[in-house]
Structures are given as structure tokens and as C-alpha cells.
């Protein structure tokens, strides 16, 4: 009984071993199939120049190695169906049953020793018979298993071969499609498979192959190629090209998709329309600019041009303080300002002169104009300068009045006086007007009394005579008045001298070519000037 149990246990062990072997064989076949598919896909990727994990050198050697490895891996799969043969084979399969039989005989002898009554039941023949049956049963089961496994393996091999052929056909179609696409031939999309990768569809890259042999770390599909120097230089050239080109819109749209390009063009048109409307708002109906600082702008500045450097100046032109001073424009502006200031001073100075008493101021202005037309420099110099000191410095002598004389000629003197008047225009304006109004009545009577016997030989202007002040040219009374008489028409009536004599005296005692108004107080010069 123990021998039968041992033989059954041996048969069960053989069956378990067969099952394990079959499971291992199937697992190996599955692994081999997967490995072969991966290797085939890797080969295709290498042919197209997209394989990242493949080594960069010796690709022909690698192909041979892959073929050898695939053959080596196929070897176990071809032998694997015969793995269950040794237990059931007649040639080399006798040793396990014999060993099992010997083990069974040993166990039977031990059982004899334990139970001598069972010895005649177990005999050599019986043991051999069971051993023979043990040999026969594994042989039959092994034959069936081998036939089934062989059939399955053949089916698997056939399917794998068909799959590989299909994959090769699909990859060939994809490669042909990509090749035609590069050459410009349009064909329908190729058949897709589970290993299809859109990054592989540009075919092999000879340049990337060469760069990879040079140990380049960048992939051939990257922007600019494997050479990083070309990437950097390409960026610089692209920027310079965008600056130098007619517009950057064409360059920008090259890297856009169709949808992005359409959106960008629509946005660009809207912005251009808004800009044109804004420019129209800044123009008058006649086409001129509404603002003065826009007069120098041209239509070319508002188009997409290669010179963005000038944009900040026009952008900040709206602010007056940031406007760059241009010499011609700035000079014209100053001349206009001077003209306006002089005309304003003329209007202010002419207000008190409209009355009867202060005829001297208007007379001086008239004489300034007449002398200027006659080109005589002598009477011009003292008339605007000498009365300037009179409102504030009453006791000053006539020779001291022209002491600060201008060294340059008349034109420069006029400019200097104009500048001083602009600087100190409204300092003494109110004071002088008040003094003029207060002393109007005091001046009228003495002026008429003293001017009748006095002589005005040549320096008296015709305008004074036209106003009705009589002058006798035969009676010169200038010498006794020069040292002691006050120089101002605003002095008290007792020591007052007429304006005509005072001007005459100033003309005679002052140098004709010198004309110093710079030393005068700045606020005293304005009422007597015509410029």
C-alpha cells in the first residue's frame, strides 16, 4: 500500500513539474514576444533617427547584436516544448523513473522491515509493474502536452510573424507618407498602429546622425538643431531680421498655427483701426495737427517700421518739459516772446504818457524811433537810461547818470536792456505809475514857465515842439544848471528843471558811444524803453 502511495505521489510530482514547466514556457514565450516587439520598434525608431535610448555609435554592430539576441531568445522557446519530454521520453527519461523506482523500492523495503506480513504482497515484479506503469503514464501525458504546446507555439509564432509583417507594412507606409510630405506630395494619411508616434514622422535625419556621432547632447528634433551655438546665433539673427524687416507681423506668423494666425491678424486689424481713429482725432478737418508739438510728426512714424527708438520722444512729446530744445524752433519762440514782452511794455508805458503832464516819456519814445530811423546813436543812449534813476535816486547829478555806460554798440545795448526789462519787468511798475500820477500837476506849470526862456539848440526832438512847448534856440542855459540842479523831473518845484533842459544836458555831458544801463537798478529801466 505504501508503494502504491509512493508511486502515486511520484506521478503527481511529475504532473506538477510538467505544469510548472509549461507555465514557465508560456511566460518565457510572452516575454520573448514582448522583447521582440520592443526590439523591432527600436529598430524602426533608429532607422528614422528618433531613438533616444540607443547608443550613438556603431549602429550596424547593434543591429547584428539585436539579431543574435533575438535568435538566442528564440532558442529557448523552440526547446521549451521539449522540456516535458525527459520524464516521458524513452531515451533519456529512464533515469527519473528508475530513481523514483529505487526510491520506491527503498521505501518498500523499509515498510517490509516495519511490517513483515506484507512482504509477499510487495514483490519485484509488482514493483516493476507499477514502475512500468509509472513510466508509461508520464510518457503518454508528456506526449499529449508536447503536441499541444508545439501546436500553440507554432500558432504564436505565426501570429507574431504576421504582426511583425503588418507592423513593417504600416511603418513603411508612414515613412513613405512622411517622405512625400517633405517632398511636397500630398497623400492620404497612413494607417496608424499602437506604436505610432507623431514625433517620428519626419524620417531619418542625416545631420542629426552626424551630430550624434560628434557626441552632441542636443537632439536633432530640437529647435536650432543639435548645435547650441547655432541656436544662439539663430535667435540673434531672427531678432535682427525682425528689426530690419518691413514689419514683425510676417515673422511672428511663421511660428503660429492657423487659428493663432487668424486671431493675431484680427487683433492687428482692430488695433490699426483704433490707432487710425486716434490719429484722426488729433488732426483738424484740414489735415493739420491740433497740437503744436505734433507738427514735426510724419505719417511714416505711425506705421510698423524698423525704428522703434524714436517712439519714446514722440510718446513723451505730450509733456512740454520733455520736449527737446531744437535751436531754430527755440530761437523763433524766444524772438516771439521778446516781441510780445516789448509790446506789452509799450502798452504799459504808454498809459501814463497819454496825459498832458508826462510828455517827456512819450517824447523819449518818439525820439528813439526817429533817431533809430536816422541812424544817429548819440541821443538814443541817455534817454532810456537817465530817467531810470530819477524815481529812486533824486539827488543824483547828470554826469553820474550815464557813468555806468554800455561798452558794446547800440544793438547790443538794446538787447541787454530788453533782457533786463524782461527780468525785472513788474518790480517798479506800480511805484513809477503812482509817482507819475502824483507829480503830474507839479510838473505841468514849472515846465511851461521855464521852457519859454530856455534854448533847445539841437538835442530837443521835434515831438516836444509839436506838443506846444516853446523853445528859444538862442538862449543856452545849460552850463549853470549842470553842477547844482537836480537830475530828476520829480524833484520839488523850487529846484525843478524842465525835462527838455535835463535831456539836453544829459546829451551834452554824456559820451555818445557809451551806454551803460547794466549798473542801474533793474526796476528803473522799463518805463523809458521802447524795446
Curated annotation (Swiss-Prot):
Compositionally biased tracts (Pro residues): 396-406
Sequence ranges of Basic and acidic residues compositional bias: 59-72, 148-185, 194-217, 227-241, 258-279, 289-302, 311-320, 361-372
Region of interest (Disordered), residue spans: 40-531
Biased composition (Acidic residues): 411-446
Modified residues (Asymmetric dimethylarginine): 131, 133, 135
Composition skew (Low complexity), residue ranges: 386-395
InterPro entries linked: DUF4594
Keywords: Coiled coil, Methylation, Phosphoprotein
Stretches assigned to coiled coil: 149-185
Complex formation: Probable component of the exon junction complex (EJC); the association is RNA-dependent.
Function: Probable component of the exon junction complex (EJC), a multiprotein complex that associates immediately upstream of the exon-exon junction on mRNAs and serves as a positional landmark for the intron exon structure of genes and directs post-transcriptional processes in the cytoplasm such as mRNA export, nonsense-mediated mRNA decay (NMD) or translation.
Protein name according to UniProt: Coiled-coil domain-containing protein 9
Native organism: Homo sapiens
Gene, per the UniProt record: CCDC9
Amino acid at each position: 500500500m505504501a508503494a502504491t502511495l509512493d508511486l502515486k505521489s511520484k506521478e503527481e510530482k511529475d504532473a506538477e513539474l510538467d505544469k510548472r514547466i509549461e507555465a514557465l514556457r508560456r511566460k518565457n514565450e510572452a516575454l520573448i514576444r514582448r522583447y521582440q516587439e520592443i526590439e523591432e520598434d527600436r529598430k524602426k525608431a533608429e532607422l528614422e533617427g528618433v531613438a533616444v535610448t540607443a547608443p550613438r555609435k556603431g549602429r550596424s554592430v547593434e543591429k547584428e547584436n539585436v539579431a543574435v539576441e533575438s535568435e538566442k531568445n528564440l532558442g529557448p522557446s523552440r526547446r521549451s516544448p521539449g522540456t516535458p519530454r525527459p520524464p516521458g521520453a524513452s531515451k533519456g527519461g529512464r533515469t527519473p523513473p528508475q530513481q523514483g523506482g529505487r526510491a520506491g523500492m527503498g521505501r518498500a523495503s523499509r515498510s517490509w522491515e516495519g511490517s513483515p506480513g506484507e512482504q509477499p504482497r510487495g514483490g519485484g515484479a509488482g514493483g516493476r509493474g507499477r514502475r512500468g506503469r509509472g513510466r508509461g503514464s508520464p510518457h503518454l501525458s508528456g506526449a499529449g502536452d508536447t503536441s499541444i504546446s508545439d501546436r500553440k507555439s507554432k500558432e504564436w509564432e505565426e501570429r507574431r510573424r504576421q504582426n511583425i509583417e503588418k507592423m513593417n507594412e504600416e511603418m513603411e507606409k508612414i515613412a513613405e507618407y512622411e517622405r512625400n510630405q517633405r517632398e511636397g506630395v500630398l497623400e492620404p494619411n497612413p494607417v496608424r498602429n499602437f506604436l505610432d508616434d507623431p514625433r517620428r514622422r519626419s524620417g531619418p535625419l542625416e545631420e542629426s546622425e552626424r551630430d550624434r556621432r560628434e557626441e552632441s547632447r542636443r537632439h536633432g528634433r530640437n529647435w536650432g538643431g543639435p548645435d547650441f551655438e547655432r541656436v544662439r546665433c539663430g535667435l540673434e539673427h531672427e531678432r535682427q531680421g525682425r528689426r530690419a524687416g518691413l514689419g514683425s507681423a510676417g515673422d511672428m506668423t511663421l511660428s503660429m498655427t492657423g487659428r493663432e494666425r487668424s486671431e493675431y491678424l484680427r487683433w492687428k486689424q482692430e488695433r490699426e483701426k483704433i490707432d487710425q481713429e486716434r490719429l484722426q482725432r488729433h488732426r483738424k478737418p484740414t489735415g493739420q495737427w491740433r497740437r503744436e508739438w505734433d507738427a514735426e510728426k510724419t505719417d511714416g512714424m505711425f506705421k510698423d517700421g524698423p525704428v522703434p527708438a524714436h517712439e519714446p520722444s514722440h510718446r513723451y512729446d505730450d509733456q512740454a518739459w520733455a520736449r527737446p530744445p531744437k535751436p531754430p524752433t527755440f530761437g523763433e519762440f524766444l524772438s516771439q516772446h521778446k516781441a510780445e514782452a516789448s509790446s506789452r511794455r509799450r502798452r504799459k508805458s504808454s498809459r501814463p504818457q497819454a496825459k498832458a503832464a508826462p510828455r517827456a516819456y512819450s517824447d523819449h519814445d518818439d525820439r528813439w524811433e526817429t533817431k533809430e530811423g536816422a541812424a544817429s546813436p548819440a541821443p538814443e543812449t541817455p534817454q532810456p537810461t537817465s530817467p531810470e534813476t530819477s524815481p529812486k535816486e533824486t539827488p543824483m547829478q547828470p554826469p553820474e547818470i550815464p557813468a555806468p555806460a554800455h561798452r558794446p554798440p547800440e544793438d547790443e545795448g538794446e538787447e541787454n536792456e530788453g533782457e533786463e526789462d524782461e527780468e525785472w519787468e513788474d518790480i517798479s511798475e506800480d511805484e513809477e505809475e503812482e509817482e507819475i500820477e502824483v507829480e503830474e500837476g507839479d510838473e505841468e506849470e514849472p515846465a511851461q514857465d521855464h521852457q519859454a526862456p530856455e534854448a533847445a539848440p539841437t538835442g530837443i526832438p521835434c515831438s516836444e515842439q509839436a506838443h506846444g512847448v516853446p523853445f528859444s534856440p538862442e538862449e543856452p542855459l545849460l552850463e549853470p544848471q549842470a553842477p547844482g540842479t537836480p537830475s530828476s523831473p520829480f524833484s520839488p518845484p523850487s529846484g525843478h528843471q524842465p525835462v527838455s533842459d535835463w535831456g539836453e544836458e544829459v546829451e551834452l555831458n554824456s559820451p555818445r558811444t557809451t551806454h551803460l544801463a547794466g549798473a542801474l537798478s533793474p526796476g528803473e529801466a522799463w518805463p523809458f524803453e521802447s524795446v
